[in-house]
Design a protein with these regions (language model features):
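Short alpha-helical transmembrane segments in multi-pass integral membrane proteins
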Residues: 2-35, 93-158, 202-258, 314-381, ...
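N-terminal transmembrane alpha-helices
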Residues: 22-60, 73-88, 92, 117-124, ...
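Helix-terminus/linker motif at the lipid-water interface of multi-pass membrane proteins
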Residues: 47-66, 135-142, 198-205, 265-294, ...
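Small-residue-rich hydrophobic transmembrane alpha-helices
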Residues: 65-125, 162-181, 288-352, 385-399, ...
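Hydrophobic transmembrane alpha-helices of multi-pass small-molecule transporters
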Residues: 77-80, 192-196, 222-226, 298-301, ...
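Short runs within selected transmembrane alpha-helices of multi-pass transporters and secretion channels
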Residues: 86, 154-173, 181-189, 210-225, ...
């Protein structure tokens, strides 16, 4: 164990494989310094689908845009299984790194690789077998069906690359390195945009070209980050003595990963159900929502991944037993999130129409109006989703991932129930779907903060 600890600490002193401890130093600057590369990286990650949406919407038309936009929602739901497993494993890595137990960290790396690798394979098989029933369940219109099916077949053929990138990104962030994932993602984003233009404009491959561009870019980021991480961080290399499926390690990884996976899956299943309701309103609403939700996701992405950085901060300090530092960190995170969300809310409300015009030609007035309405309703309440991301990260980090699932069920349950109820009322329609989303956010916030005040504020020992 001592050798493992010295290896990483020596790398820190040499500055080659830089990691960042969040258990000492100024809390505000430490959290922001660690969060910025994560925020930039995940803003860049949005370009994977935004590049497809922008180019497809401009050059292939509304039907292709509706196909790619709806496919994105399904992709997020299905890949949330992998992302949840990676995030759950990352919490365990952070706790063990905070406690400086590097032998346990290596065992966890092996167990999580086996668990997530097998899950990736099973998910791939499931998509190829059940893609048609899934699309039928989503009520995908006939004019969009084949385009969406072709896009998804290609995307999920490369899902292993998505696993590689997110796994090693989670591992690196757990030990305090949020820069390397950003570097490899930036390369992939540039490649994705270039290949989009080549495959769609030069080769005429249509929606399939957009899918291939994304898969190739993900392959570069996933394989590249994997090999570079193993090269630069010897402690990530697993030896034969670490290849032990000890029950305690398996249980810890499986518990965190499965609950985080459940949270991500519930979250995206709810979104998928709302997408099915939106699809029933026709191609114009689908296209308007597809463009607007990209802008929406891009706008609140910084607070989503600030929440992940906050979770790493909490986990490292929880592992190190620094509970008072955790309480101070909570106050800092709440203030930072509120300030950022207020700024973004004003910008999105004012710039909603110009932002829609980036994706949709000016003559498509109905689609633009639908998107503007969505953005102005959601954008006014970003602080609700910002605080919810903090709650998710907090409860994962203090060994209560089940509470994150409860909050997700509340948020998404309210959203789905209200959306279907209000949309059926004459004169409300799609407007009711838009309003159901922030209402779900705030009800989950209230429950999560009340639970913290009753239980967690008194003691961080569960």
């Amino acid at each position: 164990m001592q050798d493992g600890r010295l290896s990483i600490e020596r790398a820190q002193m040499e500055g080659k494989n830089k990691t960042y401890s969040l258990v000492t130093g100024n809390i505000t600057w430490g959290m922001l310094w660690f969060a910025v590369p994560m925020i930039l990286g995940n803003l860049l990650q949005q370009f994977y689908n935004i590049a497809d949406t922008l180019i497809v919407g401009r050059f292939l038309g509304a039907e292709a845009l509706a196909a790619v936009g709806s496919a994105y929602t399904l992709m997020i739901f299905l890949t949330s299984v992998l992302l949840g497993l990676c995030m759950g494993s990352g919490v365990v890595f952070s706790l063990q790194y905070g406690a400086r137990d590097h032998e346990a960290l290596k065992r966890s790396i092996f167990v999580s690789l086996v668990l997530i690798g097998v899950t990736t394979l099973l998910l791939n098989i499931a998509v190829f077998v059940w893609i048609d029933p899934i699309l039928q369940l989503l009520q995908v219109p006939a004019e969009v069906y084949i385009l969406m099916r072709d896009y998804l077949w290609i995307i999920f053929g490369g899902i292993g690359f998505t696993f590689l990138y997110n796994y090693y990104a989670s591992l690196l962030r757990a030990v305090g390195n949020s820069v390397l994932p950003l570097v490899f993602l930036a390369v992939a984003v540039v490649l994705n945009i270039v290949l989009d233009l080549v495959f769609i404009l030069s080769f005429g491959w249509g929606v399939r070209g957009a899918a291939w561009a994304t898969v190739i870019a993900q392959a570069v980021s996933g394989i590249g980050l994997c090999f570079y991480s193993l090269y630069r961080f010897p402690d990530f290399r697993i030896s034969r003595q670490n290849m032990q499926l000890k029950w305690a390690t398996v249980k810890e990884i499986a518990t965190y990963s499965s609950l985080t996976c459940a949270q991500q899956s519930v979250m995206n299943f709810g979104i998928l159900m709302v997408q099915g309701l939106i699809n029933s309103f026709g191609t114009a609403v689908m296209a308007g929502f597809a463009a607007a939700v990209k802008i929406d996701s891009f706008a609140y992405m910084p607070v989503q991944y600030f929440g992940n950085a906050f979770s790493t901060f909490i986990a490292q300090n929880f592992g190190a037993g620094k509970h008072e530092r955790i309480r101070k960190g909570i106050r800092v995170a709440v203030r930072v999130t509120l300030i950022f969300c207020l700024i973004i809310s004003v910008l999105v409300f004012v710039l909603a129409r110009p932002l829609m015009l980036i994706f949709i030609p000016a003559h498509e007035t109905e689609i633009i109006s639908i998107g503007v309405e969505y953005l102005r309703i959601e954008g006014a309440f970003y602080c609700g989703i910002g605080w919810l991301f903090l709650l998710y990260g907090f409860y994962r980090a203090v060994r209560k991932p089940g509470m994150s699932v409860v909050l997700t069920v509340i948020s998404l349950g309210v959203r789905v129930a209200l959306a279907y109820t209000l949309a059926a009322i004459p004169g409300i329609g799609v407007w009711g779907i838009w309003w159901s989303i922030p209402i779900g956010w705030f009800l989950a916030d209230i429950f999560g903060w009340c639970y913290y005040r009753m239980k967690q504020r008194k003691s961080l020992e569960w």
